[in-house]
Amino acid sequence: TPKCATVVVLDMSGSMRYDGLYIDVKRMGLALEGLIRREYPGDFLQFVEVYSFAKPRHISEVPALMPRPVTLYDPVVQLRADMSDEKVSEFDVPPHFTNIQHGLQLARRFLAPQDTPNKRVVLITDGLPTAHFEEQFLYLLYPPHRRTEEATMREGQLCHREGITINIFLLPSWSQSREDVQFAYRLAESTAGKVFFTAGKDLDRYVVWDYLNRRREIVA
């Protein structure tokens, strides 16, 4: 039985190219996995990659992850794709949006069977989501839209109901605004989680520190 179950949600949307943020994100993933393998081998750890969709990733896949290429440069994007339509595949969809809602949904599925009260999501991102699912429909909305924010907050509430805490590590980026920061606080605090501001270069240190703190609280 794991004492602690964690899903790490890694933002690999187009903006993570900025200042090589994606490199720091991958380094953090490897550092956290190494710590758990050495010190807490019974703990559960799963990685989920987020772009316009969310995909589970094995630790062996993390080093090869890359930010998705930006394929649309329009100042306003409002797209809807019916992913239940067999004529529509993932390859038809611009990949560089940020679907945190789908990432949290996958995280809940991984954490549901874990027999521990200590469940959490570590979300590493640089700002507001720009994609979400409503049933089979995928919405890609830029600039960030209230509809996507509300869908993501609903997913956060489901996490909270299932005893899952969301901690957010918010990376600085050129486009970050007060709205990005406020959203991170709303999402984290709705699950009794926290927001950490860290430069990318320090990310691995802070995430490992947070994990060790959490383990000490459990033991205490």
Residue ranges: model-predicted function:
Residues 19, 89-94:
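Second-shell loop/turn segments in exported
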Residues 97-103:
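Structured catalytic core of nucleotide-sugar glycosyltransferases
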Residues 43-87, 132-136, 176-187, 207-208:
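Short beta-strand-loop
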Residues 10-13, 85-89:
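Glycine/charged-rich beta-loop-alpha catalytic/anionic-binding loops adjacent to active sites
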Residues 21, 25, 96, 141-148:
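Residue-level preference for long, well-ordered alpha-helices that form the structural scaffold
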Residues 29, 100, 152:
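Aromatic/hydrophobic pocket-lining residues that form the small-molecule binding cavity
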Residues 1-76, 103-107, 117-124, 167-171:
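Von Willebrand factor
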Residues 104-120, 128-131, 135-220:
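Von Willebrand factor type A / integrin I
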